[in-house]
Amino acid sequence: MKRTTYAGLINEDYLGQTVTLQGWVQKRRDLGSLIFIDLRDREGIVQLVFSQEFSADALAVADQLRGEYVIEVQGTVVNRNADAVNDRMKTGKVEVEIHDAKILNKAKTPPFYIQDDINVSDELRLKYRYLDLRRPEMQRGLKIRNGITQAVHSYFDANGFYDIETPFLTKSTPEGARDYLVPSRVYQGHFYALPQSPQLFKQLLMGAGFDRYYQIARCFRDEDLRGDRQPEFTQIDMETSFLTAEEIQSYTEGLIKQVMKDVKGVDIKTPFTRMTWQEAMDRFGSEKPDVRFGMELKDMGVAVSNAGFKVFDNALANGGLVKAIAVPGGADQYSRKQIDAYTEYVKRFGAKGLAWMKVTDDGFSGPVAKFFKNDGDFEAITSAAAAKPGDLLLFAADSFKVVSDTLGYLRTAIAKELDLIDQDQYAYLWVVDWPLFEYDEGIERWVPAHHPFTMPNEEDVHYLNDGEDPHKAHAQSYDIILNGYELGGGSIRIHTRELQEKMFKALDFTKERAQEQFGFLLDALDMGFPPHGGLAIGLDRFAMLLSGNDNIREVIAFPKNSKASEPMTNAPSRVSDQQLADLDLNITNPVTDDEPTE
């Protein structure tokens, strides 16, 4: 028999038709003279009815069926009885009366139910990923991901972009995250690196004159094992020649508009709001602000400067800041114990503590309220904080970074707790005019805020000259933000050798090191490179957000776990002594199979 349609597409349009369906047994109900089977495929579930009246042979087959058996059936689509209609199912008004059935394959009892909202460990789900992927919510996520990629291809093709592949085996340029290294058998002692991004190759394609490039690119980063990260991920990559940052942003908005229309059926407004990096940090305490709700950071320096509260006074005297957020209705919703828990948590951002007051009709209450009882204090503070009676004021007093990180975190965490966020809203935002460099406290040196190929703002190029302070420079870079997540980022690139060498020098590269690692790029920039720029969007995160998930693993078919391993195939695994010998490699300190080195 040849399948005529998908089970999940059966509806009243098929009434009276004979259909052939193939799929998995989701559920079986035996009423003696009748057996009901819920048949599942990638499009959904339809109810099958087996009866002696329709076919004794088919009923005999149904009697053998169990969960996850793969079957093939043929039958007639009919209306359900009025009392059996199920409005929760797309197919809930109809059923299929079966007159022919065949078992294509049997199945052992699976280790978990093939349904949504299962309560099992992530490790078990990953070990049996091929079963996990049968669940409807997993199939929906990957369907959305597929819809995004189809829209991407359609949009870029319609706008004159070439889809060009770049290499997986390339040169290691150890900046930023660690590379995944691939030893060469032919050149023993030499290594390829898997690309962290197609960055340099797409720039070289602009130098080659292709003008507009895109690629759905696989990328690899050997990062520390923490957070919602994957060692391999996918990005929607683009690069253009002779366009301004605003023109590249316009193309990106057009792409996102098409994706939202095709995948979600939502018509979003363009152009998106634009906000400088400084404004984002000042107002929201984050370079990826969620603008679906208020509770913005407010500068309290003037309002609290004469109160005699040493914590605030010392911060201001040392060139720091005092800022606050007003939690609407928080005075009644947060106990001292809850606030103390937040106080302890924000120490991870470098905060020494958290000052707070509750706003009442009569003034302030709380640990620091005694410092703010003078005439005018109430009006000055509530006005500066945009607060009203019933609100909770949370203060941070420290450096710009500590204050921003602390209140930026609290703002988002509290908004989630109080359900202040419209989950149906898609708030896209451009954050522009980034610093060219940022200080990495972990390695105690200045690093590029994006990457070392980013063009400074025209008025800031002189900061890369000898005797100037390059850390004052801002960049022609831009990030696209969606609902508090960095969806992607890009920049105008440096297109002259002279300026690129100055950039490397600002990063403490010697000429020899720059030539060794990036000589091919520097040489290319000497050969008539056009002005160019581009952007990359994280496909995994985009699919995660559009599918309503909170972890990118839910929209990747075969992801790694938090230890960068893959329980289903047991990757990474040991290899044979012969394979190591072929590569002239010797493992001096092997670990056990289930013990990562980090």
Curated annotation (Swiss-Prot):
Gene3D superfamilies: Bira Bifunctional Protein, Domain 2, GAD-like domain, Nucleic acid-binding proteins. Its EC number is 6.1.1.12. L-aspartate binds at E175, R221, H450, R493. One of its GO terms (cellular component) is cytoplasm. It catalyses: tRNA(Asp) + L-aspartate + ATP = L-aspartyl-tRNA(Asp) + AMP + diphosphate. The keyword Mitochondrion does not apply. InterPro entries: Aa-tRNA-synt_II, aa-tRNA-synth_II, aa-tRNA-synth_II/BPL/LPL, Asp-tRNA-ligase_1, Asp-tRNA-ligase_1_N, Asp/Asn-tRNA-synth_IIb, AspRS_core, GAD-like_sf. It is found in: Cytoplasm. Belongs to the class-II aminoacyl-tRNA synthetase family. Type 1 subfamily. PANTHER family: ASPARTATE--TRNA LIGASE, MITOCHONDRIAL, ASPARTYL/LYSYL-TRNA SYNTHETASE. Homodimer. This is Aspartate--tRNA ligase. It comes from Lactiplantibacillus plantarum (strain ATCC BAA-793 / NCIMB 8826 / WCFS1). The gene is aspS.
